[in-house]
């Protein structure tokens, strides 16, 4: 699937250009100067635009190009606190100038040739209080955005949310995570935030049946980007006992990563299509995770009887009322992450250039001691591993004192983090200042860097 943000900006950003002049070392190099000379104003402006256009899900040659751009920016000097503050504003302005949704109301096709990527826009489109992604049910050969929109749109409007109802790109059993749909959903979220000026702290995922699976799974994969989740009559992927067919475990990458995300999971015991045992097991595992790691304080399992495969008593409005007050916990002191996506390189303030599938990370921030501790358990998945790091800035830790960073109990960094433009840019692709950081500390011994 081709990525969606491939539209060059039509004009240079004049405020950005003015800021570039303030950076030292930006005179145009002569032909005799080495290739490592800092980029000049015009080149830097173009590099920033190109990087942001490549987006937060870049893979393959697109990610390689982003890394090349970061390498060019590494020739620039460190930033002062004042320069960092100015760059934050200008990078946000640059992100906001990227395209919004192709159409901002009604029933639409995102891709025209061939026609695919159907999405419906509804709810409150003028100054919304939040963004709802409403996820339809279905399976192999079935699934229709038009089936969920009538059930959710009115309830979303009453919460003063703008609502997007996407249709999976391929109608499979796991349509919300197959065939590029997951990346497309993130693009839709970012474009909707630009189109409707939505607060990044108020993005909600909800879905019914397979859409409940989508809310569980995308919500876990991108827990750092959502305020709350409301799956109904659908659960995460179970691992089944071969002899009995009963669920014995939940697929990796879900329960651990949800530590800091509010959820209200709805299930009817008599559901003939999605048996209650999967969500019952998931709720049990959440309780076990809470005992192990803490957190999960706003997880609710709402089980009734007699509703079959329908919505909860009171419909979507009753479900949304239970999540409406939540805002994203954007910078938690404790993080648990079990990565499953090669292109998900940032999770809160953790960074992993090549995340190891199924590995388990626990990270803890001690602000009083100005210390970050990370522990890592190897995963059962394939590949990945290099590039593990933590992002920091002067709001997360105290830049006036030495920062200590530990990996598996061993000190890997002790000193003053450096404010760098390349890290501000790397963490600006989602246009979210709470996920934007000015320093990056590799989780490897300093002598090995």
Pin down the residues of each PLM region:
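Short substrate-entry loop that stabilizes the transition state in hydrolases
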Residues: 125-175, 238-239
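Primarily recognizes the serine-hydrolase "nucleophile elbow" in alpha/beta-hydrolase
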Residues: 140, 201-257
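C-terminal beta-sandwich/jelly-roll accessory domains of carbohydrate-active enzymes
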Residues: 338-449
């Amino acid at each position: 699937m081709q990525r969606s943000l491939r539209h060059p900006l039509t004009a240079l950003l004049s405020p950005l250009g003015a800021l570039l002049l303030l950076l030292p070392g930006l005179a145009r190099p002569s032909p005799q100067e080495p290739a490592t000379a800092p980029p000049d104003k015009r080149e830097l402006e173009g590099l920033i635009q190109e990087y942001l256009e490549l987006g937060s899900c870049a893979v393959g040659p697109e990610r390689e190009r982003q890394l090349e751009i970061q390498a060019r920016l590494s020739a620039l000097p460190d930033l002062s606190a004042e320069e960092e503050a100015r760059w934050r504003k200008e990078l946000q302005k640059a992100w906001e100038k990227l395209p919004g949704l192709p159409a901002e109301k009604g029933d639409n096709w995102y891709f025209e040739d061939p026609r695919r990527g159907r999405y419906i826009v509804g709810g409150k489109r003028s100054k919304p209080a939040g963004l709802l992604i409403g996820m339809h049910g279905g399976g192999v050969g079935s699934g229709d955005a038009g089936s969920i929109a009538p059930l959710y749109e009115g309830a979303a409007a009453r919460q003063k949310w703008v609502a997007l109802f996407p249709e999976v790109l391929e109608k499979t059993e796991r349509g919300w995570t197959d065939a590029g749909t997951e990346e497309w959903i993130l693009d839709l979220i970012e474009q909707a935030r630009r189109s409707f000026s939505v607060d990044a702290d108020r993005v909600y995922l909800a879905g019914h049946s397979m859409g409940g699976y989508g809310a569980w799974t995308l919500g876990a994969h991108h827990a750092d980007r959502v305020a709350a989740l409301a799956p109904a009559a659908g659960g995460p992927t179970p691992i089944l006992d071969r002899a009995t067919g009963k669920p014995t475990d939940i697929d990796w990458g879900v329960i651990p990563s949800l530590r800091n995300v509010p959820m209200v999971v709805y299930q009817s015991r008599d559901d003939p299509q999605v048996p209650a045992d999967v969500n019952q097991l998931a709720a049990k595992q959440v309780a076990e995770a809470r005992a192990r790691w803490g957190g999960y304080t706003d997880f609710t399992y709402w089980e009734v009887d007699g509703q079959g495969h329908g919505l909860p008593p009171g419909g979507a409005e009753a479900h949304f009322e239970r999540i409406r007050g939540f805002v994203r916990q954007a910078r938690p002191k404790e993080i648990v992450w079990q990565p499953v996506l090669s292109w998900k390189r940032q999770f809160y303030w953790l960074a992993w250039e090549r995340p190891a599938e199924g590995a388990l990370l626990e990270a803890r921030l001690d602000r009083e001691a100005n210390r970050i501790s990370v522990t890592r358990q190897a995963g059962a998945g394939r590949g990945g591993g290099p590039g593990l790091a933590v992002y920091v800035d002067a709001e997360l830790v105290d830049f006036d004192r030495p920062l200590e960073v530990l990996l598996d109990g061993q000190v890997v960094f002790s000193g003053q983090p450096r404010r760098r433009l390349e890290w501000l840019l790397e963490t600006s692709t989602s246009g979210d200042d709470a996920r934007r950081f000015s320093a990056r500390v590799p989780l490897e011994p300093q002598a090995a860097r």
